[in-house]
């Protein structure tokens, strides 16, 4: 169970890293670069730990799914990106797929 928690945290850190890259695109600063590096390094470390007991394909799919869905949600909530029913449906589909992979593992 701890490995799955670390996988969820890894996905959240990937999501944060992508949000930080968006922030860096708006304001070039060493601070953002350092935060991006730390965020992604922590994300990869936790992903590596999770892969000790979780199959690689499952771990990677869940990790990227969290990052993809989370990045889209951050865009909608904080950066005024388009939010329509189709977009929300497919974000939900990504999350349901991650849950399905957890159930199968």
UniProtKB/Swiss-Prot annotation:
Matches recorded under InterPro entries: Small_drug/metabolite_transptr (IPR000390), Small_multidrug_res (IPR045324)
Domain of life according to the entry: Bacteria
Location within or outside the cell: Cell membrane
Single GO MF descriptor: transmembrane transporter activity
Topological relation to the membrane, as annotated: Multi-pass membrane protein
Transmembrane annotation, as ranges: 1-21, 32-52, 59-79, 85-105
Disruption phenotype: Deletion of both gdnC and gdnD leads to a decrease in the concentration of guanidine required to inhibit bacterial growth.
UniProt entry keywords in alphabetical sequence: Cell membrane, Ion transport, Membrane, Transmembrane, Transmembrane helix, Transport
Induction remarks: Transcriptionally regulated by guanidine, via a guanidine-sensing riboswitch.
Entry GO terms, CC: plasma membrane
GO biological process: monoatomic ion transport; transmembrane transport
Keyword Electron transport belongs to the record: no
Subunit structure: The efflux pump is composed of GdnC and GdnD.
Functional summary from the UniProt entry: Probably involved in guanidinium transport. In vitro, confers resistance to a broad range of toxic compounds such as cationic dyes, neutral and anionic antimicrobials.
Record-stated family: Belongs to the drug/metabolite transporter (DMT) superfamily. Small multidrug resistance (SMR) (TC 2.A.7.1) family. YkkC/YkkD subfamily.
Stated name of the protein: Probable guanidinium efflux system subunit GdnD
């Amino acid at each position: 169970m701890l490995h799955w928690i670390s996988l969820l945290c890894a996905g959240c850190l990937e999501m944060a890293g992508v949000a930080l890259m968006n922030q860096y695109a708006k304001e070039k600063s060493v601070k953002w670069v350092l935060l991006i590096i730390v965020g992604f390094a922590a994300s990869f470390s936790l992903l590596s730990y999770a892969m000790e007991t979780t199959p690689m394909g499952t771990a990677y799919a869940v990790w990227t799914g969290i990052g993809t869905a989370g990045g889209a949600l951050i865009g909608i909530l904080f950066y005024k990106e388009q939010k329509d029913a189709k977009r929300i449906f497919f974000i939900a589909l990504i999350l349901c797929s991650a849950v399905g992979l957890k159930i199968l593992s």
